[in-house]
């Protein structure tokens, strides 16, 4: 099984050098790395032009960027990674084991840990992991992975401005329950620190509640930004 790791970016010049260093071992393990730019203006794309990394360009919008990357991918497994999230060292092996030929699941996600100074971020990450196990809904911060055939069968990511990960999870859980890898991905807590942990918690829950009530993602995206 070959893994294609798809990373949407937009103006991530400060993060790119460390991201590339984190991904080099996976390149050496024959993972395909596809970075899809959404119109960066800070030189991000030029920084990525190294052997082993494929650069694609798409219109702005994370869902659209990930779909473009998936269309380009040659792997049998797709792993969608946010630019500010770090995979564990053996991520490729863990994913292959999770989706082995005798597995009943066609998709899954990692546990997540939110990095940052506030101790409350550990609690937030813990609650995210519990919620995913109970609801079978994963978020992009948890590095969703899926067999490419099932991703295509589910219709790919809906090209909306927000909640595309929730919609994909809803479609995939009809096909099978997700596999949760107990190892952790580490995602940045910068948004939480800038805007305040409790303020961000309330915002996220309000957005999810409003989305559940039927408010379009296009209307919610402005509040998220």
Range-by-range predicted roles:
Residues 37-45, 85-86:
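A conserved acidic beta->alpha catalytic loop
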